[in-house]
Amino acid sequence: MAAVKTLNPKAEVARAQAALAVNISAARGLQDVLRTNLGPKGTMKMLVSGAGDIKLTKDGNVLLHEMQIQHPTASLIAKVATAQDDITGDGTTSNVLIIGELLKQADLYISEGLHPRIITEGFEAAKEKALQFLEEVKVSREMDRETLIDVARTSLRTKVHAELADVLTEAVVDSILAIKKQDEPIDLFMIEIMEMKHKSETDTSLIRGLVLDHGARHPDMKKRVEDAYILTCNVSLEYEKTEVNSGFFYKSAEEREKLVKAERKFIEDRVKKIIELKRKVCGDSDKGFVVINQKGIDPFSLDALSKEGIVALRRAKRRNMERLTLACGGVALNSFDDLSPDCLGHAGLVYEYTLGEEKFTFIEKCNNPRSVTLLIKGPNKHTLTQIKDAVRDGLRAVKNAIDDGCVVPGAGAVEVAMAEALIKHKPSVKGRAQLGVQAFADALLIIPKVLAQNSGFDLQETLVKIQAEHSESGQLVGVDLNTGEPMVAAEVGVWDNYCVKKQLLHSCTVIATNILLVDEIMRAGMSSLKG
């Protein structure tokens, strides 16, 4: 009897073979759920929440976040897979598949009496060799627009249908190239993702500037200005109460009137400074002038600015203030004491767009913008959410490729070649740990197998063809999902991220090893002691 039973009779215990069987079945259960998602031909899943909200997705990360997973081992694998997505932006589904397959292959040997510890030693040896092989096959190349488009397309086609993926690919790559600075890390926060429930998903576009989700608050302000100066500020243009509790006693109405005037004058002086600057820089020309303020602007100030032909937007979001100066140039001001023409940014076109009851302000045609907006359009909420998730993954894929400075062939080509390299390496591993290396090699083949299966081809037949082609030509050959025949991934432009594959090998091996070495599962928390 388990020792914990003596201490706590209500504890649930699974030992040795039973514990392993529970863990392996959990991993395989999760693998079966995500199996059909893999690759461009993967199928969709419909998630219905408790409140009845529906989500359509084939993104493994979204699925694992939204699914309610009861089993502790399955939950552990899900956390590892979502962590993979948080770090590298891709590889969630592959992660779950490989962990499940590693455990399945190990189970075959364990059922024949091999100790899990020996298999895990084989896994470690195989991982070292696999990482070494990955270093050899990675393709270091100049990350030009063509290569980045191939990388983004490979990532996006696994999330959305091909036609939409091609539209998003261009937008995603151009947005990264717009914000990229020489020898500086890429900051993806400088790409605003704005949703608009309007038109169809293929109308999604890249705006080389900014889109704000509100409009001007005065009916007489211009709806469209061209060749505009942009003043970005965080200065209150409305009467605010003092920070300390102060009062004012007056004896007559005149004194009260004086106080009101003094309070107004304080704001009016600020507005006058803006108007003076506008007259100074615009003169008699018909150039536009736009004020974007993070704080409030009261109706009197709006009216005064409107009469001067100035467009004023109030209560802009804080995250957009930094993006504004990067997109248009200029400096964000916290006071008007040192207001000068040098503080102004510039945009070729600023216009307001009304959609139903919502208003959007577009700031476009900026010179050399360092912050851009991806405007996602779609007929309904499901489509918008799906595109948003896909775009985020696409951005990460392009960023990874630039950061790595190299890519690896996709379409299951790396896995097939890696499995063959491991089998050749097997004799150099001592003793029974060779079986662990064999199990690891077989487990990696789950990726090309599932890619072929999801495309409607016979998985064994396809795999044999690819392995034969790889052995003959020595090239990295993957699955052509349209014909089921072997193809040279590099020639077609199917590229995966190097860092995703590297992270996959590390995390899958660690988790599979840890799960195999569990020989007792105890559910004996405080809750089971009650009663």
Curated annotation (Swiss-Prot):
Residues that bear N6-acetyllysine: K5, K199, K287, K365, K377, K388
Annotated Mg(2+) binding sites: D90
Keyword check for Hydrolase: yes
Modified-residue entries (N-acetylalanine), positions: A2
EC code: 3.6.1.-
Enzyme class, spelled out: hydrolase
Catalytic activity: ATP + H2O = ADP + phosphate + H(+)
Gene Ontology cellular component terms for the protein in this record: chaperonin-containing T-complex; cytoplasm; cytosol; extracellular exosome; microtubule
Domain of life (superkingdom): Eukaryota
Record keyword Phosphoprotein present: yes
Compartments it resides in: Cytoplasm
Phosphoserine: residues carrying this PTM: S205
Residues that coordinate or bind ATP: G39, G91, T92, T93, A411, G412, D496, K501
Illness: De novo genetic variants in nearly every subunit of the TRiC complex, including CCT6A, have been found in individuals with a broad spectrum of brain malformations, and clinical phenotypes ranging from mild to severe epilepsy, developmental delay, intellectual disability, ataxia, and other features of cerebral malfunction.
Name of the protein in question: T-complex protein 1 subunit zeta
Lineage: Eukaryota, Metazoa, Chordata, Craniata, Vertebrata
Name of the encoding gene: CCT6A
